[in-house]
């Protein structure tokens, strides 16, 4: 399995769970690292490479890197995997095994190719000025194994991963809404201008320019 494209950093760590949390105006001060940093030039190189027929024919299976990083993007590709986190290209030193495994740094792809085609795929990547490194191998044992600095830091059975977690049940009570304040009970608009300005002042309707400039869009 070849990791191709951008390098791995701390950006995006916790993004998968962070997107489901309640955020406030102070979130930008404490949750900035959960947002990935885009890399348009590298993305364009990947697109150009994948459009080449001689390249796409060598790919048995592939995944882009999103929520969960290496542990998910590579972890989904086969039932049995040995992943060497030391081989993952990094943006800077100091990352530990957990950070490398779950970082959601963007513009990365994981490709499954036949062992005899690895050198050929690496050569094609070099032609597009893309960094590409073999970081994992598919194994017969149905386990996801992550190694870092000579130690096994993750060793999970595929049967456990396929259960989607522990079974949970909860009791839910839905209260009947009162007539007053019912969102489905629409009132006749008496002042169009006032209603219009009220809508435009809503955070869900107003211009999102500030957010687009602040985060990865």
Question: Where are each of the predicted segments found?
Answer:
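Glycine/proline-enriched, intrinsically flexible loops and inter-domain linkers
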Residues: 1-217
């Amino acid at each position: 399995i070849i990791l191709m494209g951008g390098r791995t950093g701390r950006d995006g760590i916790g993004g998968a769970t962070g997107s489901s949390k309640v955020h406030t105006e102070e979130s930008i001060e404490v949750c900035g690292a959960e947002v990935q940093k885009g890399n348009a030039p590298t993305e364009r190189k990947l697109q150009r490479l994948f459009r080449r027929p001689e390249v796409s024919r060598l790919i048995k299976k592939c995944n882009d890197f999103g929520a969960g990083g290496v542990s998910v993007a590579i972890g989904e590709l086969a039932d049995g995997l040995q992943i060497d986190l030391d081989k993952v290209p990094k943006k800077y030193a100091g990352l530990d095994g957990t950070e490398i495994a779950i970082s959601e740094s963007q513009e990365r792809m994981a490709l499954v190719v036949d062992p005899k085609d690895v050198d050929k795929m690496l050569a094609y990547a070099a032609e597009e000025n893309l960094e590409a490194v073999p970081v994992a191998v598919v194994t017969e044992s149905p386990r996801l194994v992550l190694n870092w600095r000579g130690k096994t830091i993750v060793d999970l059975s595929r049967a456990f991963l396929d259960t989607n977690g522990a079974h949970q049940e909860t009791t839910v009570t839905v209260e009947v809404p009162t007539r007053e304040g019912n969102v489905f009970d629409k009132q006749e608009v008496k002042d169009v201008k006032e209603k219009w300005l009220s809508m435009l002042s809503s955070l869900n309707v107003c211009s999102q320019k500030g957010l687009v400039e602040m985060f990865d869009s």
